[in-house]
């Protein structure tokens, strides 16, 4: 598999414009990225632009704080699928995890998994920069139990992004049958190679073109 096919080509900034989305989808077609990852408001346009392409549309749920209710997250998923999303990246209830309310964390993830069943792949963002190693392991275990397809490191909107150490810990926890996505601060081909070596099977990056072309990113983003 080429590096491009492992990348979710990402534009999640709040000030993203239509022109930037059109560029993003054009680049996805050109380079063959796995997906474009966009905010829910851009799902429909992105799906229209990628009709017939190998790249699919990924969107974010409960993003970036994860502090919505399970019911709201489930509605977001259904709306996104209706608009053409084929993958959804949800943020867990981080406070509940820290409170050791494993039941709520699982119910929250399961609401998204159930809403997406048979229609969209689910990635669970655990926001590693806010967690202890014990919490990272517990978050991954709960996500697997709830039926996720992937676990993912970061939103790119908190205090830190992906590290090879976290990817290795997540891979060790979930085993070989669940995907692991590295996102947040992955900007170069070298960064990507480190993450893949540690166990990542998907990369979230706004610097996708720079990564596959070997050029320096014009303007580094957090994700």
UniProtKB/Swiss-Prot annotation:
Q: Does the keyword Glycoprotein apply?
A: no
Where along the chain is the active site annotated? Answer: 89 (proton donor/acceptor), 152 (schiff-base intermediate with acetaldehyde), 181 (proton donor/acceptor)
Q: Which GO terms describe its biological process?
A: 2-deoxyribose 1-phosphate catabolic process; carbohydrate catabolic process; deoxyribonucleotide catabolic process
**UniProt cross-references to SUPFAM superfamilies, sorted A to Z:** Aldolase
Q: What is its EC number?
A: 4.1.2.4
Q: Name one GO cellular component term.
A: cytoplasm
Q: Which UniProt keywords apply?
A: Cytoplasm, Lyase, Schiff base
Q: Which residues cross the membrane?
A: none
Record pathway:
Carbohydrate degradation; 2-deoxy-D-ribose 1-phosphate degradation; D-glyceraldehyde 3-phosphate and acetaldehyde from 2-deoxy-alpha-D-ribose 1-phosphate: step 2/2
State its location(s).
Answer: Cytoplasm
- Role of this protein: Catalyzes a reversible aldol reaction between acetaldehyde and D-glyceraldehyde 3-phosphate to generate 2-deoxy-D-ribose 5-phosphate.
Q: Record's family?
A: Belongs to the DeoC/FbaB aldolase family. DeoC type 1 subfamily.
Cross-referenced NCBIfam families: deoC
Q: What protein name does the entry list?
A: Deoxyribose-phosphate aldolase
- UniProt source species: Listeria welshimeri serovar 6b (strain ATCC 35897 / DSM 20650 / CCUG 15529 / CIP 8149 / NCTC 11857 / SLCC 5334 / V8)
């Amino acid at each position: 598999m080429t590096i491009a096919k492992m990348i979710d080509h990402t534009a999640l900034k709040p000030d993203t414009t239509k022109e930037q989305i059109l560029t993003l989808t054009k680049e996805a077609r050109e380079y063959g990225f796995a997906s474009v990852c966009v905010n829910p408001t851009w799902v429909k346009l992105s799906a229209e632009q990628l009709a017939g392409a190998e790249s699919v549309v990924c969107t974010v749920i409960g993003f970036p704080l994860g502090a919505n209710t399970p019911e709201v997250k489930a509605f977001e998923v259904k709306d996104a699928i209706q608009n053409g999303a084929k993958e959804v990246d949800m943020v867990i209830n981080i406070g509940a995890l820290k409170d050791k309310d494993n039941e709520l964390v699982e119910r929250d993830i399961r609401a998204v998994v159930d809403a997406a069943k048979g229609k969209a792949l689910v990635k669970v963002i655990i926001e590693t920069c806010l967690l202890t190693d014990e919490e990272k392991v517990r978050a991954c275990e709960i996500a697997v139990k709830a039926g996720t397809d992937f676990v993912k490191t970061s939103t790119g909107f908190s205090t830190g992004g992906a590290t090879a150490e976290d990817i290795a810990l997540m891979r060790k926890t979930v085993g070989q049958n669940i995907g692991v996505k590295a996102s947040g601060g992955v900007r170069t081909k070298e960064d990507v190679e480190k993450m893949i070596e540690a166990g990542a099977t998907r990369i979230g990056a706004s610097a996708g073109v720079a990564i596959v072309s070997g050029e320096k990113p014009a303007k580094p983003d957090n994700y």
